[in-house]
């Protein structure tokens, strides 16, 4: 079931984020993600609209939107991957936001494939100084240029 996250759930969401991001980014050292906890907690989760997927009292996924259009986070617990939770969360936010942008590591092909299956298109590239890795900027729906 998808519902809006409560502020009191931010620690549980942060725990789910750390588990999922470490699992989903094996090309980045786990200590990098642990070092990011204060930033994710204080700058992202605290300032985003957050929705969670809850099942039997457990949080199995979440999505965070910042500034009404930036998909800042989208994670599903590793044990719950490929059950349709990510797709349901994405459709939920797509129904509420007419335009979404996100940034994804170019090495994260499973995530890129997922986003493309949800209608996102690569529109630009960027560089992450902290990880020294390239990223794709993706947009939904596709941005038309003249």
UniProtKB/Swiss-Prot annotation:
Transmembrane segments: none annotated. InterPro entries: Acyl_CoA_acyltransferase, GNAT_dom. It is an enzyme of class 2 (transferase). GO terms for molecular function: protein-lysine-acetyltransferase activity. It catalyses: L-lysyl-[protein] + acetyl-CoA = N(6)-acetyl-L-lysyl-[protein] + CoA + H(+). Coiled coil: none annotated. Residues 1-143 form the N-acetyltransferase domain. Belongs to the acetyltransferase family. N-epsilon-lysine acetyltransferase that catalyzes acetylation of a large number of proteins. Overexpression inhibits motility. This is Peptidyl-lysine N-acetyltransferase YiaC. It comes from Escherichia coli (strain K12). The gene is yiaC.
